[in-house]
A protein has these predicted regions:
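Amphipathic alpha-helical packing segments from all-alpha helical-bundle domains
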Residues: 97, 125, 132-158, 167-172, ...
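Short, flexible, glycine-rich and Lys/Arg-enriched loop motifs at helix boundaries
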Residues: 33-40, 126-137, 192
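Hydrophobic alpha-helical connector segments
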Residues: 86-120, 142-145, 162-163, 170-173
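Amphipathic alpha-helical segments used for helix-helix packing
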Residues: 115-132, 182-190
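Alpha-helical structural segments
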Residues: 21, 25-32, 51, 68-88, ...
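N-terminal intrinsically disordered/low-complexity leader segments
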Residues: 1-21, 92, 96
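Amphipathic C-terminal alpha-helical segment
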Residues: 154, 174-192, 206-210
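Helix-turn-helix
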Residues: 25, 36-68, 72
Length: 210
C-alpha cells in the first residue's frame, strides 16, 4: 500500500484533481462492494481502501467515518437519479413516453435505476437522519422531487390531492412507485419483477386519469 508521501504528487491543480479522482474512486468502490455483498452494512473501510489500492487511513482522510461516506454515496445516488429523471422528461430524448404520459417516462426511469442499483436505491431511502421535506433536504434529493413534481403537474394538473397542498399529488405518486419498487426488490410481490413493472405503468396511467 502506498504511504502518504507517495499518494498525491504534482502541482496544486494536479493534487486537487488527484484528490477529486480518489474521492470518486472511493465512492465507486463502496458501491461495488455493497452490491457484491448485498448491502452496505458489512462493507468496511479497510475493504474500500483495498478496492482502490490504498491503506485504510486514506479513506478517513476523505470521510471521517462510515456514516459520512454513506451520506456522500446517497448524495451521488440522488444526483444520478435526478439526471435519469431529467432525461426521461425531455421530449427530445424520450419523445414517445415523455409526450404521451410523462408519468410513464419517470416511472420507467425510476424502475431502471432501482433495479440496476438495488442496494444503492435502498440506502438512499433508508439511511437515517437524512432530512426530507424540510429546508435541510439535500439538493440532489430535492432536484429529484422537483423533476417528479414537474411530470405530475404536466400529466395531472387537477389531481384531487392538490386540495391538500401543491406537493401532495407528487408525494402520492412517488409513494406508489417507491412502494411497488421496494416490494419487488425484496421479493415481496406476486409475479416478481415482470408484474411489478407492469403495475408501475398501470399506476402511471390511473394516476394521470384519476
Amino acid at each position: 500500500m502506498p504511504d502518504r508521501a507517495q499518494r498525491i504528487k504534482g502541482n496544486s491543480r494536479q493534487r486537487t484533481d488527484a484528490h477529486s479522482q480518489l474521492r470518486a474512486a472511493l465512492l465507486t468502490a463502496v458501491r461495488e462492494l455493497a452490491e457484491q455483498a448485498g448491502g452496505y452494512e458489512s462493507v468496511t473501510m479497510r475493504q474500500i481502501a483495498a478496492q482502490v489500492g490504498y491503506a485504510a487511513p486514506v479513506v478517513y482522510e476523505y470521510f471521517p467515518g462510515k456514516r459520512q461516506l454513506l451520506l456522500a454515496v446517497t448524495d451521488v445516488g440522488f444526483a444520478e437519479l435526478a439526471d435519469r429523471l431529467a432525461e426521461a422528461g425531455c421530449p427530445k430524448r424520450n419523445p414517445r413516453r415523455a409526450e404521451a404520459n410523462p408519468l410513464m417516462a419517470v416511472a420507467d426511469a425510476l424502475w431502471t435505476f432501482a433495479t440496476a442499483n438495488p442496494c444503492l436505491y435502498q440506502l438512499m431511502h433508508t439511511l437515517v437522519d437524512v432530512p426530507f421535506g424540510t429546508g435541510d433536504t439535500p439538493a440532489s434529493a430535492l432536484r429529484c422531487f422537483e423533476l417528479l413534481k414537474s411530470a405530475v403537474t404536466a400529466a395531472a394538473p387537477d389531481h384531487p390531492a392538490k386540495a391538500q397542498d401543491d406537493d401532495a399529488p407528487t408525494d402520492l405518486f412517488w409513494a406508489q412507485l417507491h412502494g411497488v419498487i421496494t416490494l419487488a426488490l425484496h421479493g415481496r410481490i406476486k409475479g416478481g419483477h415482470a408484474r411489478a413493472r407492469s403495475l408501475l405503468d398501470h399506476a402511471a396511467t390511473t394516476f394521470r386519469d384519476h
